[in-house]
């Protein structure tokens, strides 16, 4: 009787401890109540004289075993197989089944192109290899380990940007901005002075450089010269360089001999002025205007002596023979040096074409 009383007390204590767990299992949807308030083991009442109380062994109840078997075969329990624990020894899974279960249950993480672990290692190695800033407190040199050197050798030196073939070709090409190529520079608008000035020679006056001979030959100037081969170059000063007194004296000279000046302007320029094209005759060659008051006897004798043995200059568009006696007489005589007024008149352009009717 004493053993039965002890068993009842133990059963009551066990039920008191199991009740909160049973309530939790009933509230959760994933669990099914496994046991009821019935006893979990068979209460065999052997004689006390054969088996003492402390030697009594508890055996699971047959109903509990059947219930657990049915529950393990249910689909709800199969959905809990990812926990990978055996319920009963007879239903244990073999090693291959466990491996398959682990392989199927693992999450598949997409692998990126650049591993973060390798990137962290490379950044750490670069940080170690970079020279530390020198300070008063930390002046110790950076110590490289053998492992870091071997890893750097295995990884290889990084390719730099200037090693590319495209940049090497750009470096090997000559610099066109510094090369002396007149055609290329003239196309870009850079003019080169072909008349190099010596170091000791001073700069000439602007009046002397105003002529076209002292100007650098550009592409535009060459085209204009090729179009007008018979044009004469005027070496006189421009209109902006004339003095006020000379500008006032120009109209007076023009009014004195208007026809002669106009005919000489046509012969000196080499091209007819205006829209109409007039053919140049040998008789229309220019004459140097001179008046009795402007003649200089000293200049006449010197020029006559210098030009006596010199051949007569020929224009590009003029013929080689001279049919007119008047032209031969004019060319044989030594004309005086043209005055400054003649240059100022030649530098001015006529407003309208003039017909030289008096020469025909």
UniProtKB/Swiss-Prot annotation:
Residues 202-212, 225-241 have a biased composition (Polar residues). Pfam families: DUF4607. InterPro entries: DUF4607. Coiled coil: none annotated. Residues 193-245 are annotated as: Disordered. This is Uncharacterized protein C12orf42. It comes from Homo sapiens. The gene is C12orf42.
